[in-house]
Amino acid sequence: MKSLILIAALLAGTYVWFNNGNHLSAPSGTEQQSFAGPSSFGQADSNRQVQSEGVVVKVLPDDNHGSRHQKFLLELSSGQTILIAHNIDLASRISPITEGDVVAFNGEYEWNEKGGVVHWTHRDPNGRHEAGWLKAGGRIYQ
C-alpha cells in the first residue's frame, strides 16, 4: 500500500513539474518554423515572434541598466547579423557562450538599420506575452 502511495506521489510530482514549465525543453504547440527558420528578417517582421538560429560572432558586455540582459550578436545563414538581448533577471544566462557557438532562438524581433534585435527570449511571468527561449549546447534557456 505504501509503495502505491509513493508511486502516485511521484507521478503527480512529475506531472506538476512538466506542466509548470520547469523542464528544459522547447515549448510545445507553437506554430513556428524549425530552428533553421528564415535566413533573414526585415522591417516587415518587426514586432513579431520569430524563430531561427545563428552563429555567435560577438559576445557583448551585459546590459545592467534596468532589467539585466545578456547580449550577443548572431549571424544568420543569410549573413544578416542580429542582436540577442536575453533578460537574465527572468531567465538563466547562457554560460558559457563563446564566438562560434550555434544558438537557436524564439523571441520578438525588432527591426533596425543594423539588422535588428530579438528580445522576449524568456517566459512572461504575467502570461501576457508569448514565451520565448534560447537553445544552446542542447539546453533551453527561458
Placement of each model-derived feature along the sequence:
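OB-fold and OB-like single-stranded nucleic-acid-recognition modules
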Residues: 2-142
